[in-house]
């Protein structure tokens, strides 16, 4: 039941509040206080759940209560009166991104310095906490609620977007220390499995105004979001097609320098090989994200990665490095390599 009497103004259904309180709206409304409490701390504050739970608490009867947004909701004497607004967005503004706890709220203050990362086009923001960032191609707009950082450089303001490794396999690979991503400014990238365009938007930042990203996504629902991202970013070309049939979009895509693939499909090796035959320059590169459970959920992840690498070699995709994406994703690996390398003299 949770502590029934805990909600200061609890009244009536307060009991249910404790238990039902996790959903914020707390049983019988009385849960306001208790609800706020459950909502607030319940799921570790921050993030999506905490915040929302709290607000629900507000509706449930704690009046403006839960508004404490995950903060201390119910504690504030009047079911949150004190909480009201507290931290606004979920526990103290943490949890920007919802999934994966977001960027953890980039705490920079005034002393943020931007350093170039060894991958061209990627940067590191150094502040109270360090973050991986890319230079915003469309200053003033965000794509998925990520944090933005403005830095003045010789009188001109440059805006950077925090790149969250829990939302992006490529960011996870970069933070995991991948040797090469093969996407320098000005390069052309074919991105298979673009989804809603979260990572695509960062690749668009990295390759910059001279580069191009061909973003292929089969799902119409994600495709809608992708097209909205592409409306603002002139260097993204959205293609709502099945990556298994590259001939369907051959008239849209020129030769590319790099293929990035994040298609969680059992035959993704074949999908990449087909697209490479159509669009990848000889000596061009590929970066493939492999989710072990999507290919064979019964085998050990390591065995799955090894067999995928064997298949690639058979398709003239020559892997050069492989790394796992721990601690950001479980049972994922990224394989980077070269396509039809020129014969050694």
Curated annotation (Swiss-Prot):
Asymmetric dimethylarginine, modified sites: 9, 23, 25, 41, 43, 49, 52, 59, 64, 72, 78, 84, 89, 94, 99
Recorded GO MF terms: histone H2AQ104 methyltransferase activity; RNA binding; rRNA methyltransferase activity
Catalytic activity from the UniProt record: L-glutaminyl-[histone H2A] + S-adenosyl-L-methionine = N(5)-methyl-L-glutaminyl-[histone H2A] + S-adenosyl-L-homocysteine + H(+)
Gene3D superfamilies: Phosphorylase Kinase, domain 1, Vaccinia Virus protein VP39
Broadest EC class assigned to this enzyme: transferase
Disordered: annotated span: 1-114
Keywords: Methylation, Methyltransferase, Nucleus, Ribonucleoprotein, RNA-binding, rRNA processing, S-adenosyl-L-methionine, Transferase
Positions contributing to S-adenosyl-L-methionine binding: 198-199, 217-218, 242-243, 262-265
EC number of the protein: 2.1.1.-
Main localization of the protein described in the UniProt heading: nucleus
BP-aspect Gene Ontology terms: box C/D sno(s)RNA 3'-end processing
InterPro entries in the cross-refs: Fibrillarin (IPR000692), Fibrillarin_CS (IPR020813), SAM-dependent_MTases_sf (IPR029063)
Subcellular location as annotated: Nucleus, Nucleolus
PTM comment: By homology to other fibrillarins, some or all of the N-terminal domain arginines are modified to asymmetric dimethylarginine (DMA).
UniProt biased composition (Gly residues): 8-108
GO CC annotation: box C/D methylation guide snoRNP complex; Cajal body; dense fibrillar component; small-subunit processome
Family from the record: Belongs to the methyltransferase superfamily. Fibrillarin family.
Description of how the protein assembles with itself and partners: Component of box C/D small nucleolar ribonucleoprotein (snoRNP) particles. It is associated with the U3, U8 and U13 small nuclear RNAs.
Function description: S-adenosyl-L-methionine-dependent methyltransferase that has the ability to methylate both RNAs and proteins. Involved in pre-rRNA processing. Utilizes the methyl donor S-adenosyl-L-methionine to catalyze the site-specific 2'-hydroxyl methylation of ribose moieties in pre-ribosomal RNA. Site specificity is provided by a guide RNA that base pairs with the substrate. Methylation occurs at a characteristic distance from the sequence involved in base pairing with the guide RNA.
Protein name according to UniProt: rRNA 2'-O-methyltransferase fibrillarin
Originating organism: Drosophila erecta
Gene: Fib
